[in-house]
From Swiss-Prot:
Membrane topology listed for this record: Lipid-anchor; GPI-anchor
Source species, domain of life: Eukaryota
UniProt-recorded name of the protein: Lazarillo protein
PTM per Swiss-Prot/TrEMBL: N-glycosylated.
Glycosylation site positions: 38, 74, 84, 90, 130, 158, 161
């Protein structure tokens, strides 16, 4: 199961994901976002279960969540994470919009006030009620390399084994390497002080990633 799989990631991979800004590859993989995306069903709160790639400022961050709500012309994004050392909760608010005019696929563009860059947010798989697998990749302007990041989002901090098994199957179907994901702390011990805050630094990671690359 994914719970055991993520916990079995080697120490070297864990250290690598913390010290590197994100997963580097030679060119972005040819991936496809879902083509029948229902934005209304996707709204609400999501908990970051695990991520592939990491931003430097995320070190020590726990209880990562993201909350989405529909507004008049876009999607409001409220993100937060709790600093495991200072116990402070950091939040930010941005917005997302469809990357295409059809508004039928899971390709979104994410914007934040303090970032001049736009991050891509591709939903590769979701059942809306339990899980979502999100992916982002951008080619570096100064080389042939690209930077890839991905998140596993769940609707609750403690999801069932059935949901986790479904996620693992979807990762295999998407040809995403389970061992490159590191689990995000979401236990009640660490997250009790963050329950009153809506959101996580999920989309901030995208915005900061693009800021570093431009």
């Amino acid at each position: 199961m994914i719970r055991r799989g993520l916990l079995s990631v080697t120490a070297a991979l864990v250290l690598l994901s913390v010290s590197c800004s994100a997963q580097e590859t030679m060119g972005c993989a040819d991936r496809t976002a879902i083509n029948d995306f229902n934005a209304t069903l996707y709204m609400g709160k999501w908990y970051e279960y695990a991520k592939m790639g990491s931003m430097p400022y995320e070190e020590g961050g726990v209880c990562v969540t993201a909350e989405y709500s529909m507004s008049s012309n876009n999607i409001t994004v409220v993100n937060s994470m709790k600093d495991n050392t200072t116990h402070e909760v950091n939040t930010t608010t941005g917005w997302a919009e469809f990357a295409s005019e059809l508004h039928t696929d899971g390709k979104l563009s994410v914007h934040f006030p303090n970032s001049p860059s736009v991050g891509n947010y591709w939903i590769l798989s979701t059942d809306y009620d339990n899980y979502s697998i999100v992916w982002s990749c951008v080619k570096r302007p100064d080389s042939a390399a690209s930077t890839e990041i991905s998140w596993i989002l769940l609707r609750s901090r403690n999801s069932s084994n059935m949901t986790l098994e479904r996620v693992e199957d979807e990762l295999k179907n998407l040809q995403l390497d389970l061992n490159k994901y590191t689990k995000t702390e979401q236990s009640a011990k660490y997250c009790a002080g963050a329950e009153h805050v809506v959101g996580a630094m999920l989309s901030v990671a995208i915005a900061s990633l693009f800021a570093l690359l431009h």
